[in-house]
UniProtKB/Swiss-Prot annotation:
The gene is pgmG. This is MFS-type transporter pgmG. It comes from Aspergillus terreus (strain NIH 2624 / FGSC A1156). The chain crosses the membrane at residues 45-65, 84-104, 111-131, 141-161, 174-194, 218-238, 259-279, 292-312, 330-350, 363-383, 395-415, 426-446, 457-477, 532-552. Disruption phenotype: Does not affect the production of the naphthoquinones derived pigments. Residues 1-32 are annotated as: Disordered. Glycans are attached at N317, N360.
Length: 577
């Protein structure tokens, strides 16, 4: 028996031999994940507010570009590169998410998180000062790279600084800050787009800047507060967490999966490019689109083989946490998270678009229209975190949330040009409550089910699902909308060129709609509304998937006290895989 145990332990060790003292220190690191929170009182309040505020900046950057694209096109006059503004950010987020989670499992979470915050701020500054659209795209990629690390860092810091029982509540709070940033993104972006100072200040507000221009002084005070107050708090009040005490940095860096990292980045970049550019820049059957799909598919296959056979790495240090694929619990949580990301990302982008086209809303007014959706998403997230911590059951949240999301998505699909605003708000509320009930739940469930040292990796695993689901859903939704809207408009106005129609849809040429006769304009808007309604097939599919998977989730308690629980007072883990 002892020989078997020894062999198993040997197989799981990295290639570099570790001393017994280092192993003992790593065992102590495992205990740090499980112990009660050490920061108390007002200090904890300040720390948690500072950590959560960075989620606001990250979510703000996700949605701020939507309403300033026409101004960016007018500045640089390069419509063909417009998709890159979102693609660069999304590619950097998706491609590096798993990598960041592995790095967080090796290096000090506090200092790595600070590095990601700085990286994100530098990317935002680059966007604001960009002399060319290529520089702007590069800044978006850098901001996405830092933002992905920042988001994984927030979840990691919350997991290592809270007890298991209170963790769902604090993770639920990320929904509040995410919602604030999501709502402010279109509003702030639209406000700067129509102001004298211009769209560049939409990116400057994500970094420390001097409020020297009087018209935007009120909007620059909060970012100055974040940069001037939050970073010193991170430095002096946030406790350090070293996941591998006693292990040299040379050994830690040697254990990163560099080959897997390169393969994953290449596969993600080519895949996201194919989905985003297909039907927009290039036809779906063009050589460019097909080549991107083929390259992505080949690289994903090679990446899968490299991870499975541990080529150039070990089972313990693989970029992708393949061990979770052997646990049904984590597979279900991954798909659930990707599905709910589809449910709320699609309406967040297309609700403002609907009101801009059909109600002639300004960018600011269209952003405000999101309030019913986002407010109820946030409220449901907070309620989920509080009640799931108290009662422990998590399966009902997925089942009921999926059902409400399905109802809300179907209702959004039925919206026509003449549908009243009150009805649309009601549909959004149903959708928001449903999606919010389980939007962030998987983070807490996965962290509760993971082994102590797997918590950063489990966080990255669920974050990857969220980003992947949202990225693919938005890419497909954009392609469907552009294709359906272009075809519908050209059927009504056959003399219009495809380039003119696509420019009008993107917002770069509003004069196209103004020159149409009233009857023709109404027919065109009806075609646009029909195109927008088609994108809600994706949330319908995502909600249906959530309901189907929820049926197979166990009826277990995960976060509440039990007589046989561990020393944290939570039920034993692993009942679901």
């Amino acid at each position: 028996m002892s020989e078997t145990v020894t062999q198993t332990e040997t197989d799981q060790r990295p290639a570099t031999a570790r001393s017994l003292g280092a192993e003992e220190k790593e065992a102590k690191s495992d205990e740090q994940f499980q112990q009660e929170r050490t920061i108390k009182g007002f200090r904890w309040f300040i720390v948690i507010i500072s950590i959560l505020s960075s989620v606001t900046l990250y979510s703000l950057d996700n949605t701020i570009v939507a309403d300033i694209q026409p101004q960016i096109i007018n500045t640089f006059d390069e419509l063909d590169k417009l998709p890159w503004l979102s693609v660069a950010f999304l590619v950097a987020c998706v491609a590096t998410n798993s990598i960041w989670s592995k790095i967080y499992s090796q290096l000090n979470a506090k200092w790595l998180y600070l590095f990601c915050v700085v990286l994100f701020e530098v990317g935002s500054a680059m966007c604001g000062a960009a002399p060319t659209i290529n520089t702007l795209i590069g800044g978006r990629a850098l901001a996405g790279l830092g933002g992905a690390g920042l988001y994984v860092g927030v979840m990691t810091l919350l997991s290592v600084n809270t007890s298991k029982r209170e963790r769902p509540m604090y993770i639920g709070m990320t929904g509040l800050t995410w919602g604030v940033g999501t709502v402010l993104g279109p509003i702030v972006g639209g406000g700067f787009a129509v102001s004298k100072v211009g769209w560049r200040w939409s990116f400057y507000i994500n970094r420390e800047c001097r409020p020297s221009v009087q018209p935007i002084r009120p909007l620059t005070v909060p970012p100055v507060f974040f940069a001037a107050v939050a970073i010193p708090i991170y430095l002096f009040m946030l406790p350090s967490f070293d996941p591998r005490p006693g292990v040299s940095y040379k050994e830690r860096l040697a254990q990163l999966d560099y080959l897997g990292t390169i393969l994953m980045i290449g596969a993600c970049v080519s895949g996201v490019m194919a989905i985003n550019f297909g039907g927009q820049i290039y036809p779906w059957d063009s050589g460019q689109t097909i080549s991107c799909f083929v390259v992505s598919g080949v690289l994903f296959i090679v990446f899968g083989l490299q991870q499975w056979y541990c080529i150039g790495t070990t089972k313990e240090n693989r970029t992708f946490p393949c061990q979770f694929l052997a646990r049904p619990a984590f597979i279900i949580l991954f798909v659930q998270t990707a599905s709910v990301a589809t449910v709320f990302f699609v309406p967040i982008y297309f609700v403002p678009l609907f009101f801009q086209f059909t109600r002639n809303d300004s960018a600011i007014d269209a952003g405000v229209r999101l309030l019913p959706l986002v407010c109820f998403i946030v409220a449901a997230m907070i309620l989920n975190g509080a009640l799931m911590s108290k009662f422990g059951y998590y399966m009902p949240w997925y089942l009921v949330g999926g059902c409400l999301s399905l109802v809300g998505s179907v209702l959004m699909y039925t919206i026509k040009l003449g549908t009243s605003t009150a009805n649309i708000y009601g549909y959004m509320i149903i959708l928001g409550v449903g999606g919010g009930m389980y939007a962030q739940a998987s983070f807490a469930v996965a962290q509760g089910k993971a082994r102590p040292r797997e918590i950063p990796v489990a966080t990255g695993f669920i974050s990857l699902a969220q980003l992947t689901g949202g990225t693919i859903a938005l890419a497909i939704a954009n392609s469907v909308f552009l294709e359906k809207a272009s075809a519908g408009i050209m059927a009504v106005v056959p003399d219009a060129s495809k380039e003119t129609v696509q420019s009008a849809i993107s917002g770069a040429s509003s004069s196209f709609f103004q020159t149409l006769d009233p009857d023709v304009r109404e027919a065109v808007l009806a075609a646009v509304t029909h195109a927008i309604s088609q994108v809600y097939i994706l949330p319908i599919t995502g909600a249906a998937m959530s309901i189907s998977l929820a049926i197979f989730m166990p009826r277990e308690k995960l976060f509440v006290a039990s007589d046989s629980g561990d020393r944290d007072g939570v039920t034993p883990l692993g009942a679901m895989g």
